[in-house]
Amino acid sequence: MPEVRSSTQSESGMSQWMGKILSIRGAGLIIGVFGLCALIAATSVTLPPEQQLIVAFVCVVIFFIVGHKPSRRSQIFLEVLSGLVSLRYLTWRLTETLSFDTWLQGLLGTMLLVAELYALMMLFLSYFQTIAPLHRAPLPLPPNPDEWPTVDIFVPTYNEELSIVRLTVLGSLGIDWPPEKVRVHILDDGRRPEFAAFAAECGANYIARPTNEHAKAGNLNYAIGHTDGDYILIFDCDHVPTRAFLQLTMGWMVEDPKIALMQTPHHFYSPDPFQRNLSAGYRTPPEGNLFYGVVQDGNDFWDATFFCGSCAILRRTAIEQIGGFATQTVTEDAHTALKMQRLGWSTAYLRIPLAGGLATERLILHIGQRVRWARGMLQIFRIDNPLFGRGLSWGQRLCYLSAMTSFLFAVPRVIFLSSPLAFLFFGQNIIAASPLALLAYAIPHMFHAVGTASKINKGWRYSFWSEVYETTMALFLVRVTIVTLLSPSRGKFNVTDKGGLLEKGYFDLGAVYPNIILGLIMFGGLARGVYELSFGHLDQIAERAYLLNSAWAMLSLIIILAAIAVGRETQQKRNSHRIPATIPVEVANADGSIIVTGVTEDLSMGGAAVKMSWPAKLSGPTPVYIRTVLDGEELILPARIIRAGNGRGIFIWTIDNLQQEFSVIRLVFGRADAWVDWGNYKADRPLLSLMDMVLSVKGLFRSSGDIVHRSSPTKPSAGNALSDDTNNPSRKERVLKGTVKMVSLLALLTFASSAQAASAPRAVAAKAPAHQPEASDLPPLPALLPATSGAAQAGSGDAGADGPGSPTGQPLAADSADALVENAENTSDTATVHNYTLKDLGAAGSITMRGLAPLQGIEFGIPSDQLVTSARLVLSGSMSPNLRPETNSVTMTLNEQYIGTLRPDPAHPTFGPMSFEINPIFFVSGNRLNFNFASGSKGCSDITNDTLWATISQNSQLQITTIALPPRRLLSRLPQPFYDKNVRQHVTVPMVLAQTYDPQILKSAGILASWFGKQTDFLGVTFPVSSTIPQSGNAILIGVADELPTSFGRPQVNGPAVLELPNPSDANATILVVTGRDRDEVITASKGIAFASAPLPTDSHMDVAPVDIAPRKPNDAPSFIAMDHPVRFGDLVTASKLQGTGFTSGVLSVPFRIPPDLYTWRNRPYKMQVRFRSPAGEAKDVEKSRLDVGINEVYLHSYPLRETHGLIGAVLQGVGLARPASGMQVHDLDVPPWTVFGQDQLNFYFDAMPLARGICQSGAANNAFHLGLDPDSTIDFSRAHHIAQMPNLAYMATVGFPFTTYADLSQTAVVLPEHPNAATVGAYLDLMGFMGAATWYPVAGVDIVSADHVSDVADRNLLVISTLATSGEIAPLLSRSSYEVADGHLRTVSHASALDNAIKAVDDPLTAFRDRDSKPQDVDTPLTGGVGAMIEAESPLTAGRTVLALLSSDGAGLNNLLQMLGERKKQANIQGDLVVAHGEDLSSYRTSPVYTIGTLPLWLWPDWYMHNRPVRVLLVGLLGCILIVSVLARALARHAARRFKQLEDERRKS
């Protein structure tokens, strides 16, 4: 057997080392799996658009580099690379762009997504089919013709003209094969006598069956029963074979007995409608070349060659085994091949055109043929799906699946074309992405898909022409697709007419009217977009959206116009098509003398064009003979020369008999090399191809004289071209004309309304409010504020405009103000005067009241051990000059008790200071000071009038005089007297410790400090430390009983004990004593307070029993929100905190804490369910009123107070299929991860509007208006994982992370100097208080060690507190940071090396580019004079552990650092790995190496590793591509070798 080679076999091998690795058993599988995992990892990670552009750019560069040198391996690489880019696009589409706000948007967006999924599926299936074309070569036949098999040649016909069929029959009779072993049969389903006569004349067999059931398949099956050849060769009646057909194809059938089918290409020597009708069509490959030049050759590699109904040899045994040709569908050919392959038969494809046929002459016929193909393939898909059933390999299943699903293109194509109209007409944004994101993801996907297809298809199909082909047929196929999928038995076989003539060109409306309608609609959408871009007042987002969708519409319109241009049928008067051919000929006279020699230019059944020089002037048609030699056989053909000149002669044949006709057919069609140039088109160049498509549109706009009114062609009729899918043409014309009129009218109305809208004002300015006095303390009320006591809703009390006694307050003169100060100074020692501004009491700023927000208030507390003896409210501010004293006022109340009334003076808008005396009996522990604004006449107020307002300055004062009450020393009152929850201010708790500062005593003190931190929470607490009892005030004394100060009397205890005793120096002060007989008992006593499971006794003494404390789990701090299930708002705050009153009820806040190391896959948002009930009553406009939702001062969403279902919902409610809108609304809301950090607060602002603005309404209606959230509203963090990149001091500033991962700090040790001073110990206690406030849990697990014993806690996180005098001891602990402390200075000691910087720049090029001009910040700061530094770095003792160092030369610096941690405003500035605090100034730095703490599931590591790292995505993705290509190329080569080896084995057996 001769050697059979494929391009796969000839491909150059892998490099030597890769070849050796792959040759190891199992190595290919391992490398392939690793490469696939890398590829999946790279495709699963999305990047911000600007980073994705880097990936896109590099992939494009790689595409050009690899594609520059074509080879099999480079093609495979480009396909895998395209898969990588497309899968990244798909991941981005599925995870980033599916955000729909309306049902219409969701429907349209889902339709587009499904269309894209279909397109991607077809892209990958096409790559699979064409990854390794087999390029099968002919095999020689046995040398002895006696061994050649017998062949029956079938030429089925139904209604075609004899002039067409006779060419095929005569050509078949001329095939080189032993005459006794071949028989030509005319299968005439038309049962026409002239065909029978022709068969008898030429020597062919004539077969006509009595009935026509099952169309072509039935005809063939009938002929099988009347013939007996070993093989069956089938030609459609217009396919004229070459003489070498059997000799080139039969070798494979003889050599391999498993081959049931040998298919060859269908080549058409006449142009198809696209080539003929489009201006650039003549230089464009025929539509079918892609299938026969690329796809079928690729199918052959997978043993999945399809039977195409003609130009194919079939083994009779195989056909009979399946019961004949398939008749269940209208595409008997593909279904027949599928049936044979299910039984184990193989199929083969020889990519050599051995027959030529006629293409469809007119577009309407072409569409009709494709309709039949689509119906048939979809019928097979439904009734004999290749994915199911037995007998097929996965390669065969996928190839057949690709062929069948390719005919589903109609619906996706229409969706792609019309999608921009969703925004241009309806304002529905169906892809939730910015134009930059689309540029970064979608354009590379399309570039690689087009570019790779161009490399694969070469000159077989030009880029962008598939879009024209599909668009031309899409709207016709939509109905066919849907009907066939739903009812696969519908439809019948339709014969495609061939050989018609067109006397004159015309515009075929019946073939393009759907696209004309679509084009008009698209033009209307484009016009709308251009109009809005030109004249609309658009913001940046809307402008980009219009620009993007207009560009999309423009591209769609160009494709549609190109498809419409195909409908301009060109004139076709030639009976015979010219075929280019270069054949030496001699022109002779009748006597045989040679007149001239020449070479043919083209041939046809009508004549020939010959390059020659005619020796004399031609006076008229002259009879001649043209003589040539073909394959050793001389042909002499009679002709007449009718024109000669310019080196060219035109001849027509003068055929008188069948033999002469046979000779002409042999010359024109029968040459073995007749069609070898069928694929000689220039290689595809996508940009030139796009230009050709655009130029083809120009054909639509030729001069009107070229447009001929619709007329029927001479022959044939298109009566059955579309069967049941084509209506009466005249009706189509009427529909088209009516549609054009309707679209034109709509366009006119749209333009008129748009113009009217453009000429009208876009907005009406609201009436300007009355001028307010300029004052820095009068800011406007924000729409959404964080929850503060100053912005909280006031109480429901509503004092009248004129209260009892009607005290209106008196202006406070300057001497009166001085008297207040003097009075405060002369107060007796037992009384204390407190002066608070409203800002001190918690007001966020000046208090402004309007009609919609008439009631504002402030909450404040009075210590429970103090008694108010007198009070005075001193107010200043301003009131609108539009207010009238007889109807308008501001009334003040304290705890709903009347204080006084402010009346406006229109001539003097500002007022104050004005003094109001307050009865001290009004005061309680928790107080509310309310300001109630009356904005109208008595009993009626215009609450919507923005010109009516009143403002109370934040500098107004409340002066309170108090006296101390006798102390009550009861442990049950703890944390009083040290902290009173009603007094919302920073707390100071003195600590008295033995000067030796024993670690166990310090641990006990730390437990108590953290407990106080829990009690004070965000207010903060400071612990001044001393070794002596203070002379006055309260304090906590901690120590072993025998070591307590002698001045205290050293109380006798029998174990751990807690006592409250009077201060020896201050009878009104209390000393809390925490003691025991030894240090362990002191710790137990501290735990007795911190972990008390029951209320402490109402006594001053308590003996403490040992406390059992369960080990803590990670992230289970009581202050942290649960993360394993949705958490109710009602579990975070009381129900009263979720309620508000009035049209503007203020901000409702839901605070919570959460670990800051949260991470979600691809930054998926957390889920929140907001539930609220729409208020009852008719005084509120609930459709215009809304609820604004935010988190940490970041706006999230707004919801109207009325639940709406839209138009469809209203219809469903009307027919009883949906429930009416209820009062309770439930909304699901996404919370972006970047808005969440340790200390968080949800904000809800009800902005209610009255039903009728500007109308006098009852003033009581406002305050009786109740709004609120349902406590069953939830927020869910269960999708979060814990991992973080360190160092990051921002985590420490919010909730003490990473130390508070365990609430009791059991994984933390505090490193103090060997002999700490009081300032250092105080800093330690303040820090423990901060930790307790962060976790609401005492730090019972923390250890205290010195630097010399730090190795004992090497596996823990370390908190280092040190002064400069002891900084040398802790220097080794900061060895992994970039800083050192020396000579009282903090300095930078190391920067990243040049190599490190290069690696960082490659890893994150965008950041490196942005920071290209910045230099590393060198730190050289003296840590003296109150300057403190906080440094965070990885522990040198254990990887993944953290060291946090607080350093300063004195206590003031340490105290400054800790105060900074407790201030919310400064926390935002704490970040990086170093913070330096100097007074109010704070500086952050980031220099130290990063490290990672936490764990993730395996599937999340790619996202974590490559998130925001485009270079890593590229490296991992390209590594995956290289590995997969290496394995795939080797596997494909071995697969091809196995196919040919099987053939050789079969031959040896035979």
From Swiss-Prot:
Residues annotated as domain PilZ: 572-647
Residues that bind substrate: 236, 238
Origin: domain of life: Bacteria
Chain residue ranges for the region called Catalytic subdomain B: 317-377
Stated consequence of mutating residue 188 to P: Loss of activity
InterPro entries: Cell_synth_A (IPR003919), Cell_synth_B (IPR003920), Cell_synthase_bac (IPR018513), Glyco_trans_2-like (IPR001173), Glycosyltr_2/OpgH_subfam (IPR050321), Nucleotide-diphossugar_trans (IPR029044), PilZ_domain (IPR009875)
Region ranges (Disordered): 708-731, 768-813
Sequence segments annotated as region (Catalytic subdomain A): 147-240
One of the record's GO cellular component terms: plasma membrane
Residues the record marks as active site: 189, 333
Xref: SUPFAM superfamilies: Nucleotide-diphospho-sugar transferases, PilZ domain-like
Impact noted for substituting residue 369 to M: Loss of activity
Primary location recorded for the protein, binned into one broad class: membrane
UniProt-recorded Gene Ontology molecular function terms: cellulose synthase (UDP-forming) activity; cyclic-di-GMP binding
Coiled-coil annotated residue ranges, if any: none
Residue ranges crossing the lipid bilayer per the database entry: 26-46, 47-67, 106-126, 398-418, 423-443, 468-488, 507-527, 547-567, 1513-1533
Region (Catalytic): 1-741
Homology family: In the N-terminal section; belongs to the glycosyltransferase 2 family.
Domain notes: There are two conserved domains in the globular part of the catalytic subunit: the N-terminal domain (domain A) contains the conserved DXD motif and is possibly involved in catalysis and substrate binding. The C-terminal domain (domain B) contains the QXXRW motif and is present only in processive glycosyl transferases. It could be involved in the processivity function of the enzyme, possibly required for holding the growing glycan chain in the active site.
Identification of the protein by name: Cellulose synthase 1
Organism: Novacetimonas hansenii (Komagataeibacter hansenii)
